[in-house]
Amino acid sequence: MLQPKKTKHRKTFRLYHDKRDAHSGNFVAFGDYGLQATGSAWVSAAQIEAARIAITRRMGREGQVIIRVFPHLALTSKPIGVRMGSGKGSVDRWVAVVKRNTILFEVRGVKDEIARDALRLGGHKLPLKWKIVATV
């Protein structure tokens, strides 16, 4: 799964859910079709990987999938049954902070109906609302 190779600090502050629009990464740049977030959420590395697998399996051997988000934020958690205190918990998972209108995945090199169907299948694996956009 996706996670940074090296970070300056092992544990980070927990960011708030930013409900504003994304000002970068909000248009299809590399492919023909894209999966655009219409809401904001934290998307975990496992969810990104599940969506990628669903998209690539639908596309078969043709075409290319571009992942436009990366999980940079480390979320920590304490084990079940441990009392409060005694420091911050260990890193549990990595998440990508996704703002509204961010392009999550792009597809190129396949037919229109296959690309839309593949992105639809991948979008169902994600915890946010989305829409399929195309370059004109």
Swiss-Prot record:
Which biological processes are named by the entry's GO terms?
A: translation
Q: Which InterPro entries match?
A: Ribosomal_uL16, Ribosomal_uL16_bact-type, Ribosomal_uL16_CS, Ribosomal_uL16_dom, Ribosomal_uL16_sf
A cellular component term from Gene Ontology for this protein is:
cytosolic large ribosomal subunit
- Gene3D superfamilies linked to this entry: Ribosomal protein L10e/L16
* RNA-binding among keywords: yes
Q: Name one GO molecular function term.
A: structural constituent of ribosome
Sorted keywords for this record are: Ribonucleoprotein, Ribosomal protein, RNA-binding, rRNA-binding, tRNA-binding
Q: What family classification does the UniProt entry report for this protein?
A: Belongs to the universal ribosomal protein uL16 family.
**PANTHER family named among the record's database cross-references:** 50S/60S RIBOSOMAL PROTEIN L16, LARGE RIBOSOMAL SUBUNIT PROTEIN UL16M
Protein name from the UniProt record:
Large ribosomal subunit protein uL16
Organism equals Mesomycoplasma hyopneumoniae (strain 7448) (Mycoplasma hyopneumoniae)
Gene symbol here is: rplP
